[in-house]
């Protein structure tokens, strides 16, 4: 098993590139199943274990998948008759595998998908997915760890109001409705940039989707969708992680590919703390010096502060003066990294859904383990400024969402290595 070893204290400087977005490429790959004519080519695809997993899922469904890692490109040909079942072997590894259900229902009228896996942060229920499919005319039942869906009369447009703006449910319902007969209106939808990217992709394939990025999405179903070439948007969570790497080390970094409009809530908090940010068409420059101001953070659905940046922001707040409170409203079990920060001498207490940070912590190197994907990055960030040596284990989480993070940080001046232990 690998571990990352960091000797803290180096100020990071230089330029770094952002990969394609993990949270965009996974739904776009599954949406490629919608194309019954021609093949799709996706570019700017990050080399992640989750991409490998979803490619394997698509292959089991009888799609032909070619992954060129050297060119960060994936070709998907889904023109053959698709298999209806996404097996537990792959789906159990990653929650996003549930996203094949919408395309399978749209193409075949029936699907069997194992209940999903992924990071252990909260229950993340699938009720909203099921609600949407049922509204579109599918019969759903759960049996022996599988979700069985059947729309014997085909999917039909519907008016759907989500109880919560679930990202996955929004994506799944969009894909199912894109080939349904008639018009669908989905209210209280997720508004993340990744939703917009998915809608843009389906529209490029011949779909008719409007309103992505707003509270209400309207879909006019079409009879057929076609394979196209599509570039995945930059990863705003990786970009945010790298901005914090610059801020936490009081460094000077240009993050090429960072898009201001995709991370407005994070940028607002960084500026409130006294971090200097400069915006260019090609990316964002981050510089920081001296003491940072205390701020409170509350995670919310987009455009609120992203839960996927909560643990990285916690690492930064450990280096700021004063009293700080982080409130997690999206997932109920996303403070598992607090115990690991405490091993590094962090002064944090947790009360329910809030974590309280008192003063500036004198972080010390320790052996810590990643508890989920973003916590892995956060512990590495803390290690960049901790006194002494930090060792981060359980890197399987990190590899699900970051490409060569240690290498990028090393190129900026960090004393960091990935070693086989």
Swiss-Prot record:
Domain of life: Bacteria
GO molecular function: UDP-N-acetylglucosamine 1-carboxyvinyltransferase activity
InterPro entries, per the entry: Enolpyruvate_Tfrase_dom, Enolpyruvate_Tfrase_sf, MurA_subfamily, RNA3'P_cycl/enolpyr_Trfase_a/b, UDP_GlcNAc_COvinyl_MurA
EC number of the protein: 2.5.1.7
Gene3D superfamilies: Enolpyruvate transferase domain
Subcellular location field: Cytoplasm
UniProt keywords, alphabetically: Cell cycle, Cell division, Cell shape, Cell wall biogenesis/degradation, Cytoplasm, Peptidoglycan synthesis, Pyruvate, Transferase
Ligand binding (UDP-N-acetyl-alpha-D-glucosamine): 95, 124-128, 308, 330
Transport among keywords: no
GO biological process: cell division; cell wall organization; peptidoglycan biosynthetic process; regulation of cell shape; UDP-N-acetylgalactosamine biosynthetic process
NCBIfam families on file: murA, PRK09369.1
Entries under HAMAP family matching the protein: MurA
Protein name from the UniProt record: UDP-N-acetylglucosamine 1-carboxyvinyltransferase 1
Gene coding for it: murA1
């Amino acid at each position: 098993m690998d571990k990352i070893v960091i000797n803290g204290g180096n100020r990071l400087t230089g330029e770094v590139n952002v990969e394609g977005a993990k949270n965009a490429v996974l739904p776009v790959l599954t949406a490629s199943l919608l194309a019954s004519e021609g093949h799709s080519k996706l570019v700017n695809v990050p080399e992640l274990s989750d991409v490998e997993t979803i490619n394997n899922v698509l292959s089991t469904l009888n799609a032909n998948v070619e992954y060129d890692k050297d060119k960060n490109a994936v070709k998907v040909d889904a023109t053959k008759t698709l298999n209806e079942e996404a097996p537990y072997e792959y789906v159990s590894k990653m929650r996003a595998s549930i996203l094949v259900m919408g395309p399978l229902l749209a193409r075949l009228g029936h699907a069997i998908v194992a209940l999903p896996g992924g990071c252990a942060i909260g229950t993340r229920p699938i009720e909203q997915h099921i609600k949407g499919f049922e509204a579109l005319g599918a019969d759903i039942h759960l049996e022996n760890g599988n979700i069985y869906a059947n729309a014997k009369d085909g999917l039909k447009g519907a008016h759907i109001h989500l109880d919560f703006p679930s990202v996955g449910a929004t994506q799944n319902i969009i894909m199912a409705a894109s080939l349904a007969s008639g018009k669908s209106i989905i209210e209280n939808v997720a508004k993340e940039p990744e939703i917009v990217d998915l809608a843009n992709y389906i529209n490029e394939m011949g779909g008719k989707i409007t309103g992505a990025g707003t509270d209400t999405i309207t879909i006019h179903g079409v009879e057929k969708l076609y394979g196209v070439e599509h570039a995945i948007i930059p990863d705003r969570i990786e970009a945010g992680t790298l901005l914090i790497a610059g801020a936490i080390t009081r460094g000077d970094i240009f993050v090429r590919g960072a898009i201001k409009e995709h991370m407005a809530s994070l940028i607002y908090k960084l500026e409130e703390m006294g971090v200097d940010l400069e915006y260019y068409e090609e990316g964002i420059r981050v510089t920081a010096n001296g003491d940072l101001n205390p701020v409170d953070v509350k995670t919310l659905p987009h455009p609120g502060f992203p839960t996927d940046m909560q643990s990285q922001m916690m690492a930064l707040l450990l280096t700021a003066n004063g009293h700080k409170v982080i409130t997690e409203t999206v997932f109920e079990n996303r403070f598992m990294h607090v115990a690991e920060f405490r091993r590094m001498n962090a002064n944090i207490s947790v009360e329910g859904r809030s974590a309280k940070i008192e003063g500036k912590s004198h972080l010390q190197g320790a052996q810590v383990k990643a508890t989920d994907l973003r916590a892995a990055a956060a512990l590495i960030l803390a290690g960049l400024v901790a006194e002494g040596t930090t060792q981060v284990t359980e890197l399987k989480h990190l590899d699900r969402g970051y490409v060569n993070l240690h290498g990028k940080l090393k190129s900026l001046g960090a004393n960091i290595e990935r070693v086989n232990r």
